[in-house]
């Protein structure tokens, strides 16, 4: 089905290296989920509860109430995986993550050998994806990180492999629909595909037709869930009702760190506070089932941004810092937070053993932090380097750009914009890191060529 061209650079040594690296990557992921204890908390606990309810055939509910607080795709798919396996154990979810992670590595490799013929870029980027601490550790949590990255890798693969559009475009619409049902901001992703197509092909008619076809299929994929939400909540909710909730908590007069904050700590006028108290029944009702909050929160967030554009921009940059330049604290917090085995060891260790453990822990965390900062730095740098050419290409009928540049840049810019506006925290960098890995490899290749000319 794929039109494999001679440009695709598959050499025996490189293929052997990739297979060995793939096996090492899988073994590291399996080792992590079997040896590093963690507790599923907050969103991860909610996903497990939703998936368990699907497994038990009680529906997409929390505490017996219908809910659409988060995207439905991941917990629903996981619930059916539980049914297939006959249990709803956490280890089943973790093994599912490893399978998805393995498939993602294969897909990224296939994408890289189509994206570029440069060996250094292919194998540097693939090495980073296979061995990246984040991509190993997050197999340990019941969350959307591994799932959405798998879907996104398929979407990118379908963009770079050009075959019959009668098959290709519906497949893109299908997977983008799945991504939107996981993360609702992917409803805007058909525009990303259209921009990438336009910059490559410079055929406006084909670009518009492609956009329309992808958007239509995506909408058809989302439509049944939208209809379900209308039946349950009496209003149009395409995927979830937490966008206004997140938007307001991240953009209000009392927010100083650009991140989520408890409702009780967010600014609220007396009138708004009265509405909140009524909706939440003075704290007796969970925010996760209070779909009415979106209706009152979203206008308040928009109003605050209009009245405080400078403060909004400040929060946006703080969000980007928190997402891409705050190191890897999220790995400790989400993927290895069960400290009971360590606490038991600390009671019997000597002082020297405790010091050695603490030193090793800080050393490992320092290395992880440097990797994230390095990838993020090169990722942002590559966006900036290519920004001028891409902007000129958007308004030119003849200036085309290859996927090698547009795929990492446009996708990175898409996530950067989303996080700038809505919400940022370290674990949100997860799906972007594969684009940053490609950008890093491309930047290193540029540096190598520059040094050769000196």
Question: What are these model-derived regions, one by one?
Answer:
Residues 42, 69, 93-100, 124-154, ...:
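Multi-pass, polyprenyl lipid-linked donor-dependent membrane glycosyltransferases
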Residues 114-116, 155-171, 198-201, 444, ...:
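Membrane-interface transmembrane helices that cradle and orient dolichyl/undecaprenyl
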Residues 92, 312-408:
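Membrane-interface anchor segments at the N-terminal boundary of transmembrane helices
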Residues 238-345:
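Membrane-proximal stem/loop segments at transmembrane-domain junctions that anchor or position
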Residues 95-116, 154, 158, 381-385:
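Transmembrane-helix motifs of polytopic, lipid-linked glycan transferases
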Residues 17, 92, 105-131, 149-150, ...:
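Transmembrane-helix signature of polytopic, membrane-embedded enzymes
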Residues 36-50, 59-61, 65-80, 87-91, ...:
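Extracytoplasmic catalytic/substrate-binding loops of multi-pass membrane glycan-assembly enzymes
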Residues 20-22, 72-76, 84-106, 123, ...:
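Loop-to-helix entry region of an early transmembrane alpha helix in multi-pass inner-membrane enzymes
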């Amino acid at each position: 089905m794929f039109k494999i061209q001679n440009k695709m650079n598959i050499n025996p040594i490189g293929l052997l290296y990739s297979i060995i690296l793939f096996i090492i990557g899988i073994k590291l992921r399996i080792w992590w989920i079997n040896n590093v204890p963690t507790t599923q908390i907050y969103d991860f606990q909610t996903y497990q509860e939703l998936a368990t309810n699907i497994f038990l055939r009680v529906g997409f509910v929390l505490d017996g109430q219908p809910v659409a607080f988060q995207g439905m795709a991941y917990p629903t798919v996981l619930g059916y995986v539980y049914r297939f396996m006959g249990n709803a154990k956490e280890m089943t979810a973790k093994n599912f993550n490893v399978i998805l992670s393995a498939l993602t590595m294969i897909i990224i490799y296939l994408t890289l050998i189509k994206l570029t013929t440069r060996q250094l870029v292919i194998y540097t980027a693939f090495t980073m994806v296979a061995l990246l601490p984040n991509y190993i550790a997050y197999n340990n949590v019941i969350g959307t990180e591994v799932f959405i990255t798998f879907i996104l890798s398929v979407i990118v693969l379908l963009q770079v492999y050009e075959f019959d559009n009668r098959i290709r475009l519906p497949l893109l619409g299908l997977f983008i629909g799945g991504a939107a049902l996981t993360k609702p901001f992917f409803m805007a992703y058909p525009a990303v595909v259209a921009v990438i197509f336009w910059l490559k092909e410079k055929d406006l008619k084909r670009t518009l037709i492609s956009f329309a076809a992808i958007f239509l299929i995506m909408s058809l994929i989302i439509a049944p869930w939208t209809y379900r939400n209308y039946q349950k909540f009496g209003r149009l909710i395409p995927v979830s009702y937490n966008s206004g909730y997140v938007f307001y908590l991240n953009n209000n007069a009392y927010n100083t760190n650009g991140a989520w904050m408890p409702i009780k700590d967010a600014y609220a006028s007396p009138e708004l506070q009265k509405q909140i108290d009524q909706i939440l029944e003075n704290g007796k009702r969970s925010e996760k089932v209070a779909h009415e909050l979106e209706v009152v929160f979203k206008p308040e967030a928009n109003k605050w941004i209009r009245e405080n554009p400078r403060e909004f921009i400040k929060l946006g940059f703080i969000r980007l810092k928190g997402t891409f330049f705050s190191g890897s604290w999220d790995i400790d917090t989400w993927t290895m937070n069960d400290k009971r085995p360590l606490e038991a060891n600390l009671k019997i260790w000597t002082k020297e053993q405790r010091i050695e453990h603490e030193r090793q822990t800080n050393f490992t965390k320092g290395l992880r932090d440097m990797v994230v900062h390095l990838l993020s730095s090169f990722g942002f740098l590559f966006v900036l380097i290519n920004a001028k050419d891409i902007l000129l290409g958007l308004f030119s009928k003849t200036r085309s750009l290859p996927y090698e540049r547009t795929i990492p840049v446009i996708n990175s810019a898409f996530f950067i914009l989303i996080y700038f506006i809505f919400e940022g925290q370290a674990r949100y960098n997860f799906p972007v890191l594969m684009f940053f890995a490609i950008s890093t490899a491309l930047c290193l290749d540029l540096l190598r060529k520059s040094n050769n000319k000196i």
